[in-house]
Amino acid sequence: MPQQAALAGHFTLPGTSMTLNRMGYGAMQLAGPQVWGPPRDVAAAISVLREAVDAGVNHIDTSDYYGPHVTNQLIKQALHPYPEGLVIVTKVGARRGADKSWLPALSRQELIDAVHDNLRNLGLDTLDVVNLRVGGFMEPSDGSIEAPLTVLAELQRQGLIRHIGLSNVTPSQLAQGQSIAAIVCVQNAYNVVLRKDDGFVDDLAARGIAYVPFFPMGGFTPVQSSILDDAAASLHATPMQLALAWLLQRSPNILLIPGTSSVAHLRENLEASKVEIPRKVIGDLDSLGR
């Protein structure tokens, strides 16, 4: 499966030399149940990471609050010293409670500690890209991001961060963010049924900024899932493959980070770049959006 990930094309983050294959990998599912603790099978998790990179994935999404600490430590164990050209994108702005809850962590000290935790657990001196995560679980909440983003900009000037992105944000928050630091990517919930960001995707594409959707199969009703299943079967694809293929065809600035803890599912996801969606099927899928 050499360079399978490259078949989806590539995108260069604005103002950088980082050219990423559009099919990346999200490490969230490598942790244990509820994204807590170690995986049931560490060797399998290591195999998934190594196979992803062998297949041409050069963009891994992670965070030190996955586990916590678990996915970053697995990435280091599997891939360090890192191959040339591999870009590791991490997130800060949240933490895990002792009850496994997801809590905001946006104070100055929490952000500084999070960056240093990521550096230590990934075995890096500088983080390639750090996304500032704000808002709710899946929905952005409009409000000022000046204070936390200013902290990341300071850490960038200190050489601890190369580039900055935003996660779970609104267009107005992006505008505010761009007045503080150069923003190379936006990571929001978006898929064939969650279409609130349609205009945002197009605006970012016009500016040359990457859009990285998470939850490619999230938010489907049973009826919508059934329609997706039928459309996928008609194309001899899995529903996930069709959902990913739709995103790839939606806009050239979209970068994918599907996650899995299975080598078999990793291979299936990478095959999504081969799925060609006829115009009629695209119309059927577009009718699902809300």
Walk through the language-model features, giving the residues of each:
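N-terminal binding-site loop/beta-alpha segment at the start of enzyme catalytic domains
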Residues: 1-86
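Beta/alpha (TIM)-barrel catalytic core signal, keyed to glycine-rich beta->alpha loops juxtaposed to Asp/Glu
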Residues: 3, 7-10, 135-290
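Short, well-ordered coil/turn segments that N-cap beta-strands
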Residues: 19-23, 56-58, 83-86, 124-128, ...
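Active-site mouth loops of central-metabolism enzymes
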Residues: 30-43, 98-109, 138-141
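Short, acidic/polar
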Residues: 38-52, 106-121, 170-174
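Short beta-strand segments at enzyme active-site cores
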Residues: 59-64, 89, 126-132, 165-166
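A short, structured active-site edge motif that brings together acidic residues
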Residues: 85-98
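Active-site groove signature of glycoside hydrolases
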Residues: 119-139
